Regions:
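Acidic/His metal-coordination segments adjacent to aromatic residues that form catalytic metal sites
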Residues: 17-21, 56-59, 96-110, 141-149
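Alpha-helical bundle segments that constitute or directly flank the non-heme di-iron/ferroxidase center
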Residues: 14-45, 68-79, 153-156
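Acidic/histidine-rich alpha-helical segments that form the ligand environment
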Residues: 28-39, 97-134, 154
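Short linear motifs at secondary-structure transitions and domain/linker junctions
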Residues: 24, 31, 64, 88-90, ...
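Short, contiguous alpha-helical
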Residues: 2-13, 49-93, 122, 134-174
């Protein structure tokens, strides 16, 4: 089977066959939490809460934003796979940051939530058939989105925000 790779789930000895392109995307998706964890490593609570760049979120706020959107995207992907063209609601990151106690949250809890959500979703994604990645949902703002598009978007979400964390670290000289 050219262009395909067998993937063995370590906790389930059943061999799943996933297209290589999807497996590579799933691997990138799984790598995100480690990248995020490394980007905040060694930061004190004060540094996590600091806003060294005017008008920008603190590092903790960035991590909380990422943690809030992981279950949202997981739900969207599950609904696209399980339901027929489900409605996918948009979120409001600024409203979440304002109302969801970002300054009181614990960075380790947020990182753990991201890691566990992605591990669970990767297990589900690896069980899918190639055609399942073309299933669609209807986003309230963006219109029709495939499961593949949702996976690509959430996979790129952490790397996108790591740039801002690195910018804050430079501004704090850490």
């Amino acid at each position: 089977m050219a262009g395909r790779k067998e993937v063995q789930d370590q906790t389930n000895p059943t061999v799943r066959t996933v297209p290589m392109s999807y497996e590579a995307l799933i691997e990138q998706y799984l790598a995100g939490p480690g990248l995020l964890r490394r980007s905040v490593a060694g930061m004190t609570r004060g540094q996590l809460l600091a806003r060294p760049i005017a008008g920008k979120w603190s590092t903790l706020e960035v991590v909380c934003h990422l943690a809030d959107y992981e279950p949202i995207y997981a739900d969207r992907m599950k609904r696209v796979f399980a339901l027929k063209e489900p409605e996918l609601l948009k979120g409001d990151p600024a409203l979440f940051a304002e109302r969801l106690a970002y300054d009181r949250r614990d960075v380790e809890e947020e990182l753990a939530l991201i890691e566990l959500t992605r591990k669970q979703m990767a297990r589900i994604l690896r069980a899918l058939k190639p055609e399942d990645f073309q299933r669609k949902g209807s986003h309230s703002r963006d219109g029709a989105l495939t499961l593949k598009t949702l996976l690509q978007r959430i996979t790129g979400h952490i790397p996108h925000h790591i740039r801002f964390i690195e910018e804050k670290r430079r501004a704090l000289s850490i």
